[in-house]
């Protein structure tokens, strides 16, 4: 089985964006700052799964979406675990002030391209 460790993954770059997988420490920092209870719970679950399953961490962590120009974080996306029946689920959140710029579609395309190059992934379900 191929390992999907955070330390082995270079950021994914698109024309305007950089997607960077977050470490457990980074997830913990975001979790303490998050105001929304539902999102705080999701960040906590990601952090716990990254620690518990380090060889599959890229399927459990959040990927920060940042602008190439200026480095500003504009959102977060990530998978909801490893593939089940050759399918992974993908969720996302673009911060309100950055919506309607096409960042979400660009980030989803890039992360889906990465996932389809991984062994055992044939389908991706995107959760809105």
Please place each PLM-identified region on the residue numbering.
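Glycine-rich acyl-CoA binding loop
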Residues: 102-105
